[in-house]
């Protein structure tokens, strides 16, 4: 496996990561989560050390499955992500609700910290500005306590809007949809992130 430095951090992540949005539908519905956890463990055997998960993925079971797998490897050998936004908080942007959401993710993942915690699914600048106003301070607090190691964001915005987010210097990295069909709408944002020493992870390749 080829490993790359994540932005200006000291973290070396696998060039191919593991997305955990979908597992076998029948296994999930039947509660065969240990069987599902064989997938991230197999990925780990092949050198994949970046596991991406989130609340609500896979009928709200993805973090649990990831935690089952994570408990069977050395924690420092894997970089784990999760995510939060106003939707997962049911539009309740209180500190207590944010903390409950984060602690639920930590409990499910069977870990005491998350390597990359995403401000999740920023669709446009208006959405991003609202999340920055209401939630960013909670991210900073959690980071200062060691509950999360890096504040990052995921987005489906176009490149010029991504550039504006990057230029704030508030994030260590981003998760962005990027492929042969949409590259022209995202390229400038990715270039700006690289110039600013941010890590870039691609989804929907």
Language model segments and positions:
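Structural preference for beta-strand elements that scaffold enzyme active sites
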Residues: 5, 13-17, 49-50, 77-83, ...
């Amino acid at each position: 496996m080829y490993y790359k430095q994540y932005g200006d951090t000291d973290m070396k992540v696998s060039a191919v990561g593991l997305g955990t949005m979908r597992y076998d539908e029948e296994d999930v519905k039947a509660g065969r989560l240990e069987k599902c956890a064989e997938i991230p463990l197999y990925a780990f055997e092949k050198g994949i050390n970046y596991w991406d998960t989130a609340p609500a993925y896979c009928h709200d079971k993805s973090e649990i499955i990831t935690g089952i797998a994570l408990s069977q490897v050395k924690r420092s050998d894997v970089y784990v992500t999760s995510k939060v936004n106003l939707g997962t908080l049911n539009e309740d942007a209180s500190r207590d609700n944010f903390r409950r959401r984060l602690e639920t993710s930590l409990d499910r993942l069977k870990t005491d910290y998350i390597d990359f915690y995403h401000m999740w699914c920023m669709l446009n600048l208006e959405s991003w500005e609202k999340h920055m106003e209401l939630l960013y301070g909670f991210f900073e607090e959690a980071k200062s306590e060691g509950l999360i190691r890096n504040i990052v964001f995921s987005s489906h915005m176009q490149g010029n809007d991504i550039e504006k987010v990057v230029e704030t210097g508030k994030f260590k990295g981003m998760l962005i949809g990027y492929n042969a069909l949409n590259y022209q709408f995202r390229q400038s944002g990715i270039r700006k992130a690289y110039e600013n020493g941010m890590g870039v992870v691609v989804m929907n390749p």
